[in-house]
Amino acid sequence: MATPHINAVPGAFAETMLFPGDPLRAKYIAETFLENVEQVTDVRNMLGFTGTYKGKRISVMGSGMGIPSASIYAYELIKEYGVKNLIRVGTCGAISTDVKVRDVIIAMGACTDSKVNRLRFKDHDFAAIADYSLLSAVVDSAKEHGTQIRVGNVFSADLFYTPDPQMFDVMEKMGVLGVEMEAAGLYGVAHELGAKALCVVTVSDHIRTGEKTTSDERQTTFNDMIIMTLDAAITL
């Protein structure tokens, strides 16, 4: 049955889904890496697709930008469509000087300035962590592909244009590897509903040094990350 934000029919989505922010990136993943692809939802142009990868049924759908948007789609996908494994794939900005542009970060945990998980957890701090089985599968796949990865915490920011750049100093002191905008909310929804979630992001730019990837570098690194993640997804 359709939800307010998804018009797919029951059974349209696979149990495992890649979850990029950009719906056009979802379209690119589906058309580039999947076979037998079908577009299954398009409400608000938030495109979702289902196909197969090496014979296994896989879905991919955009989440939009930020925790509120990602949380809505994750909730409806898990609650109404039975999605069990949600893997966010996207980009982030690096903070630590030992994290390099084009590195892949696997978010073991997600700090945040959002109150969304406190709302879920009676105003207490909730440890927003990834599912270990998903994390382990992607780490193993990265080793097989020879992909340079970092495993640790990210920071899920509510504001893209922060009014407090000194917060980056605190993040670096606490060992945060990168900044993005969705993981903490995704992890909270997954825990609330008994699903599994993981965030895998490539470093597209460095907040400290100002270094940025070119569009070609970004696409190549992104492709490598997607293949690595899809190869992990088919083992679940």
UniProtKB/Swiss-Prot annotation:
Active site residues of this protein: D205 (proton donor)
GO biological process: purine nucleoside catabolic process
Coiled-coil regions listed: none
GO MF terms held by the record: purine-nucleoside phosphorylase activity
Pfam families in the cross-refs: PNP_UDP_1
Catalytic reaction(s) noted: a purine D-ribonucleoside + phosphate = a purine nucleobase + alpha-D-ribose 1-phosphate; a purine 2'-deoxy-D-ribonucleoside + phosphate = a purine nucleobase + 2-deoxy-alpha-D-ribose 1-phosphate
One GO location term (cellular component): cytosol
Gene3D superfamilies, sorted: Nucleoside phosphorylase domain
Protein keywords: Glycosyltransferase, Transferase
Site (Important for catalytic activity): R218
Enzyme Commission no: 2.4.2.1
Residues binding a purine D-ribonucleoside: H5, E180, M181, E182, S204, D205
Binding site for phosphate: G21, R25, R44, R88, V89, G90, T91
Enzyme class: transferase
Superkingdom of the organism of origin: Bacteria
Chain's role: Catalyzes the reversible phosphorolytic breakdown of the N-glycosidic bond in the beta-(deoxy)ribonucleoside molecules, with the formation of the corresponding free purine bases and pentose-1-phosphate.
Family stated for the protein in its record: Belongs to the PNP/UDP phosphorylase family.
Subunit description: Homohexamer; trimer of homodimers.
Identification of the protein by name: Purine nucleoside phosphorylase DeoD-type
Organism: Shewanella denitrificans (strain OS217 / ATCC BAA-1090 / DSM 15013)
Gene: deoD
